């Protein structure tokens, strides 16, 4: 019984897991994900991790010049790759399974929000 109780006492709550993750990885930022995508910040807000990315382009106005259909395709490609990467990470999967959610925010180089979405446990389960 004592061993069981100790293992429960050490179990992380979603808030604690998010805080520990953000504290650890914040020290490694900024992180260049691809030549056009940089992770600039990770914040924990309760049981939510907020990831702030900057999208860089050769021409700063390139995003604004995309037709709506092209912009939606661009966003969908980033979301698909980002979800695939998150759902392969064991630490992320463990956090999602205990109730942590990931808010993914994507900004232009001048700080304008381009799009955002949330990753939850069920999103990764759909990929399996």
Task: List each model region and its residues.
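Sec-dependent signal peptide recognition
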Residues: 1-4
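N-terminal signal peptide c-region/cleavage motif recognized by signal peptidases
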Residues: 6-9
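N-proximal, solvent-exposed amphipathic alpha-helical segments enriched in charged/polar residues
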Residues: 11-48, 56-58
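Short, intrinsically disordered, charge-biased short linear motifs at domain edges
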Residues: 18-20, 70-77, 109-114
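Extracellular/lumenal and peripheral-membrane lipid-interaction modules
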Residues: 29, 33, 73-79, 97, ...
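Polar/charged, Gly/Pro-rich intrinsically disordered segments
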Residues: 35-38, 45, 50-60, 92-128
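Mature extracytoplasmic domains of secretory-pathway proteins
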Residues: 44-93
